From Swiss-Prot:
Catalytic reaction equation(s): Endonucleolytic cleavage to 5'-phosphomonoester
Gene Ontology MF: a single term: RNA-DNA hybrid ribonuclease activity
Species classification: Bacteria, Pseudomonadati, Pseudomonadota, Gammaproteobacteria, Alteromonadales
UniProt entry keywords in alphabetical sequence: Cytoplasm, Endonuclease, Hydrolase, Magnesium, Metal-binding, Nuclease
Keyword Cell division: no
The protein's name: Ribonuclease H
Enzyme nomenclature, EC number: 3.1.26.4
Domain RNase H type-1: residue ranges: 3-144
Amino acid sequence: MAELKQLYIFTDGSCLGNPGPGGYGVVMKYKHQQHEIADGFSLTTNNRMELLAPIIALETLYEPCNIILTSDSQYMRQGIMTWIHGWKKKGWITSTKQPVKNVDLWKRLDAVSQLHKIDWHWVKGHAGHIENERCDVLARKAAEAKPQQVDTGYNPE
């Protein structure tokens, strides 16, 4: 079996108002190459953007990879590493017997992450981590750009 390519992915989400206009930012590194992705939505939440960032990054890959994925979102990291197993067993119901919020994105993240070997890392936001700061700028600019794109999965309660 061929050795998997080693990638480093950094992600962040931003929302102005929460809910409000939102965006995500991604920095992907492979060897000496760096690629950035960002996009915005007219109405969404911070948590949805924190989930969408790694989804978009992973969906751009065309082959299985060994990935170190770094985010400042404990919600995303805890969810994909710990909570999701119970949610799936209970039919996407939380421990408090409520439907899992953002289930559309959790299902996408679960599916796309199965294709890769991923180490999920957390970094404190706004603490000077170069790639996290860059993702924050990308996400904020995408949110501030008056995006017209609709987050079809956003469901205000």
